[in-house]
Amino acid sequence: MLTTTFALLTAALGVSAHYTLPRVGTGSDWQHVRRADNWQNNGFVGDVNSEQIRCFQATPAGAQDVYTVQAGSTVTYHANPSIYHPGPMQFYLARVPDGQDVKSWTGEGAVWFKVYEEQPQFGAQLTWPSNGKSSFEVPIPSCIRAGNYLLRAEHIALHVAQSQGGAQFYISCAQLQVTGGGSTEPSQKVSFPGAYKSTDPGILININYPVPTSYQNPGPAVFRC
């Protein structure tokens, strides 16, 4: 009986430590963000080769609305509840081809470029700036072309990443309309799946012991104007 109780308590604590990424700006949950498959159970993607590594969508349908943001500004992305596990936040953009609907575009192919990543503070343990936070300011590059975009939010939890397949990916995709901007086309684009391997040093890593003295973020370099 005690064993059963302990197992149930452990499972409950595990779920409560998970989170979703459901909202951008001043909108409501899942208004501008495509409803993720973890919207009820706060689960995660564990397979970097899964189609779910792209936007982790519960259904093929897009979100109800599109959030407007000015190039060169920032947009706030919200977690619910706050980020609990150690690991980096990363954000990618993908421009929707002209003539296609942002609400139905899948984001397939080498169309994603990274706009933000974070490095940990090194010491007795690795501490990422996102830990304990529930909102993040995502920079929208000033030089990119105006148009509709998908903004992919990703938190990679590394607390059990010492074994292959142990990293946990918390993901969602927001629908944006970017206004203003310039004419620059980012050259270093990746696809999801395809951008990561389960053996990448920023994915397969023991952050507990010995404590690393460096960290290599997975994916391409951050695009800068």
Curated annotation (Swiss-Prot):
Disulfide links within the chain: 55-173, 143-225
Family: Belongs to the polysaccharide monooxygenase AA9 family.
Chain's role: Lytic polysaccharide monooxygenase (LPMO) that depolymerizes crystalline and amorphous polysaccharides via the oxidation of scissile alpha- or beta-(1-4)-glycosidic bonds, yielding C1 or C4 oxidation products. Catalysis by LPMOs requires the reduction of the active-site copper from Cu(II) to Cu(I) by a reducing agent and H(2)O(2) or O(2) as a cosubstrate. Shows oxidative cleavage of xylan in addition to cellulose. Shows a strong synergistic effect with endoglucanase I (EGI) with a 16-fold higher release of detected oligosaccharides.
Official protein name in the record: AA9 family lytic polysaccharide monooxygenase A
EC number(s) from the headed UniProt entry: 1.14.99.56
Binding annotation for Cu(2+): 18, 85, 170
Uppermost EC category: oxidoreductase
Keywords assigned by UniProt, alphabetized: Carbohydrate metabolism, Cellulose degradation, Copper, Disulfide bond, Metal-binding, Monooxygenase, Oxidoreductase, Polysaccharide degradation, Secreted, Signal
Record-level Gene Ontology MF annotations: metal ion binding; monooxygenase activity
UniProt subcellular location: Secreted
Transmembrane feature ranges: none
Any one cellular-component term (Gene Ontology): extracellular region
Cofactor entry: Cu(2+)
Residues holding O2: 159, 168
Segment forming the signal sequence: 1-17
PANTHER family in UniProt: ENDOGLUCANASE II (PTHR33353:SF3), PUTATIVE (AFU_ORTHOLOGUE AFUA_1G12560)-RELATED (PTHR33353)
Organism the protein comes from: Thermothelomyces thermophilus (strain ATCC 42464 / BCRC 31852 / DSM 1799) (Sporotrichum thermophile)
Catalyzed reactions per annotation: [(1->4)-beta-D-glucosyl]n+m + reduced acceptor + O2 = 4-dehydro-beta-D-glucosyl-[(1->4)-beta-D-glucosyl]n-1 + [(1->4)-beta-D-glucosyl]m + acceptor + H2O
Cofactor binding description: Binds 1 copper ion per subunit.
Gene Ontology biological process terms in this record: cellulose catabolic process
UniProt cross-references to Gene3D superfamilies, sorted A to Z: 2.70.50.70
Practical use: Lignocellulose is the most abundant polymeric composite on Earth and is a recalcitrant but promising renewable substrate for industrial biotechnology applications. Together with cellobiose dehydrogenases (CDHs) an enzymatic system capable of oxidative cellulose cleavage is formed, which increases the efficiency of cellulases and put LPMOs at focus of biofuel research.
Classification via InterPro entries: AA9, AA9_LPMO
Activity: how regulated: Is able to utilize various natural phenolic compounds as reducing agents. Most of these reducing agents are present in plants, either free or as lignin building blocks, such as sinapic acid, or as flavonoids such as catechin and dopamine. Phenolic compounds with 1,2-benzenediol and 1,2,3-benzenetriol moieties yield the highest release of oxidized and non-oxidized glucooligosaccharides from cellulose compared to monophenols or sulfur-containing compounds.
